[in-house]
Structures are given as C-alpha cells and as structure tokens.
Amino acid sequence: MWTNTCCSHPLGIPGETGSNLPDSVDGVKRAAQRKLDHELGIKKEQVPFEDFRFLTRIHYKAPSNGKWGEHESQYTLHDRSLVISTNKHDAVDYILFIKANVNLDINLNEVRDTKYVTQDELKALFKDPTLKFTPWFKLICESMLFEWWSHLDSGLEKYTDEQEIRRM
C-alpha cells in the first residue's frame, strides 16, 4: 500500500512538544528531522529546520471498506517529488513542506519501497486500479496537495501559517 513515507511521531520530550501553535510547529519539525533520518536515512543537515514551511493543520476521517476506517492524525511533509508524512500529535495533522535534495538510505524495517514522482505521475498512479493508497494520503492529495504543489516554486506563501484547523 502506497502512502507517505515517513512518520515523525513527536515524542513527549522537550523540543518536540509545545503549548501553543508556534512551539507545536517547531516540535513537529524537529520530530520530522529525527524520523526522516530513522526511516529514510535523510540526515538533518539535508533537511534544515528553517527550511520546513508550515502550511496548515487538518483533522480528517477516512472511511474504508465499511468494516474499517480511520479517524486520526497525520503530519505531512512534502518535498517536490518525495512525499513524507509524520504521525499523531494532539489529534490534528500539521502540514509542512520542504524542498530539498536528499540522499536516501532506507530503513527496511520501516519502509518497503520509495518512488520519486512528479505531480502528473502521482495523478496517473491514483488512476491505476492495481495500486492501493492509504485513505489519508489520497484524501490530502486530492483535496489540497496538488494545489499546493503547483505553487511550490512561486506563490506558496499564500497557503502558509494558517491558524485554523481544516476539517476533512
């Protein structure tokens, strides 16, 4: 099943938690750096803290096959063509973008496979009935990611630092 490739899992330790939005965003960024290294072997020097851009927070619910569904949180980080996600924090997803050239050293206990794709390639993959995607990844992509991705090089500022939580 294809999905985002990194889950940050912020820990209840100094530096990865916060009592207000700016501190929480900073904590998510630090956790993302830690887990990018753990899961994908991306060293934090390749994904500098200050290069992460906070866009918004979301709270989502994704029904599945009628028997199972999902109602939890994912933080999602996106590079130009590498999609990375982080996980649960205060039951709200934090959406961060980072554009970086990275070297991968995959932790096979965490990640089965990776694929760099363009926006058009990802849209084509979604149409392939033989491929399966996690519900949260597809929901975020179809409702917001493609719009943001189109503005990654110019105009992304209008999407950054949202104060409201989007309900999905």
PLM region spans:
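A short coil-to-beta-strand element that immediately follows conserved catalytic motifs
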Residues: K43-L55
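Nudix hydrolase/Nudix homology domain
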Residues: W2, C6-C7, I13, R53-M168
